[in-house]
């Protein structure tokens, strides 16, 4: 049988997906985090892999799913949170625009799986399955009640799950994880299709969503999940030392308020008293596409007048950020390679060929 006859759609998918293979898995495993630092990698959306100087590995909001894949149904799902928010009927054209940079089934070394809330792009059954099948049998799954309900429903043993609410602290080796208030108002209108939100006092945010502060020996990381802007960021900034803060950024479509704007990101950073602010989530959905350079432009306009004590950092999915080594950088660039040029003699027709 010829090559073109033996190749199938399934063989094509298996040979190309996930796009990065186990490249990033291997990079994370091989990383030796220096004392006085922490390293983290952006997995897409709000997914983060954090590694401490003691070699502790935790992942937050690692999601391996996708968005719209067909025009088949032109209507939004009845009762969807965006329908409740804006009174829309048409299908939301949210296509995933980010490649899959980490293979969940190639994960071997992990000390905790965390989720900030139960929206589909922040918690993943494939990640849960991979960790249950391939990793140590004591790796905990940490999140608010709605996330634990999902994990248990998927088959994660209840005793492997830890329910957290604001004020709770969980120690995972040398990382101290503080659950803090979340400000994700979209989560409050994520309800069963037959349940009405109009005129009804929402149930508590604390069972649905949390923010996290990761205190490591080498510095502290604030993860805001899908939180909108809130005055309470200032309270968190008063109560905790925050070195790096991550905020969900995006260009909200007409009639929608679901992501922080560039101004919100700057206000969040100022309120938290962070040293570095990094936008995320803007990478993932085609209809929330936003340019993070806007944050830097506004920062340049305001930093001297408002005496900002922080810098913005523009990241790339799959890229690494090391605190404090990268604290004065403004943008990430993937490794360019070719640092070993001319270690062997080039094989060219003549020296001036190139």
From Swiss-Prot:
Enzyme Commission no: 3.1.1.-
Recorded catalytic activity of this chain's protein: L-ascorbate 6-phosphate + H2O = 3-dehydro-L-gulonate 6-phosphate
Location in the cell: Cytoplasm
Signal sequence residues: none
InterPro entries found in the cross-reference section: L-ascorbate_6P_UlaG (IPR023951), Metallo-B-lactamas (IPR001279), RibonucZ/Hydroxyglut_hydro (IPR036866), UlaG-like_MBL-fold (IPR048021), UPF0173_UPF0282_UlaG_hydrolase (IPR050114)
Cofactor: a divalent metal cation
Inducers of expression: Induced by L-ascorbate. Repressed by UlaR.
Group of enzyme by EC: hydrolase
A cellular-component GO term for this protein: cytoplasm
Chief location: cytoplasm
GO biological process assignments: L-ascorbic acid catabolic process
Pfam families linked: Lactamase_B_2
GO MF annotation: an example: manganese ion binding
UniProt pathway: Cofactor degradation; L-ascorbate degradation; D-xylulose 5-phosphate from L-ascorbate: step 1/4
Keyword Hydrolase in record: yes
SUPFAM superfamilies tied to this protein: Metallo-hydrolase/oxidoreductase
CDD domains linked: UlaG-like_MBL-fold
Keywords: Cytoplasm, Hydrolase
Function: Probably catalyzes the hydrolysis of L-ascorbate-6-P into 3-keto-L-gulonate-6-P. Is essential for L-ascorbate utilization under anaerobic conditions.
Record-stated family: Belongs to the UlaG family.
Name of the protein in its database record: Probable L-ascorbate-6-phosphate lactonase UlaG
Native organism: Salmonella gallinarum (strain 287/91 / NCTC 13346)
Gene from which this protein is expressed: ulaG
């Amino acid at each position: 049988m010829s090559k073109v006859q033996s190749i199938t759609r399934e063989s094509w998918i298996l040979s190309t997906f996930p796009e990065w293979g186990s490249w990033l898995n291997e990079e994370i495993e091989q990383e030796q985090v220096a004392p006085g630092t922490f390293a983290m990698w952006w997995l897409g959306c709000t997914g983060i892999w954090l590694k401490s100087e003691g070699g502790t590995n935790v992942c937050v909001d690692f999601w391996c799913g996708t968005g719209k894949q067909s025009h088949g149904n032109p209507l939004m799902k009845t009762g969807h949170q965006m329908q409740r928010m804006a009174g829309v009927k048409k299908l939301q054209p949210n296509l995933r625009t980010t490649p899959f940079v980490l293979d969940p089934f190639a994960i071997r070394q992990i000390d905790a799986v965390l989720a900030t809330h139960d929206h589909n792009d922040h918690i993943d059954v494939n990640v849960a399955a991979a960790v249950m099948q391939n990793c140590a049998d004591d790796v905990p799954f940490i999140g608010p009640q709605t996330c634990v309900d999902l994990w248990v429903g998927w088959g994660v043993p209840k005793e492997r799950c830890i329910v957290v609410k604001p004020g709770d602290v969980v120690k995972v080796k040398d990382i101290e994880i503080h659950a803090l208030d979340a400000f994700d108002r979209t989560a409050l209108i994520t309800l069963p299709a037959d349940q009405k939100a109009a005129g009804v006092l929402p149930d508590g945010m604390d069972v649905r969503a949390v923010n996290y502060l990761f205190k490591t020996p080498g510095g502290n990381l604030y993860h805001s999940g899908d939180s909108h802007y809130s005055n309470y960021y200032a309270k968190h900034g008063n109560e905790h030392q925050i070195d790096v803060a991550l905020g969900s950024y995006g260009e909200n479509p007409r009639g929608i308020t679901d992501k922080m704007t560039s101004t919100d990101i700057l206000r969040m950073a100022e309120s938290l008293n962070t040293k570095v602010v990094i936008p995320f989530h803007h990478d993932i959905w085609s209809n929330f596409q936003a340019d993070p350079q806007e944050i830097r432009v506004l920062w340049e306009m305001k930093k001297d007048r408002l005496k900002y004590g922080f810098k913005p950092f523009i990241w790339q999915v799959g890229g690494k950020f090391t605190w404090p080594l990268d604290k004065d950088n403004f943008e990430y660039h993937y490794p360019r390679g070719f640092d070993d040029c001319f270690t062997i003699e080039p094989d060219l027709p003549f020296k001036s060929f190139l």
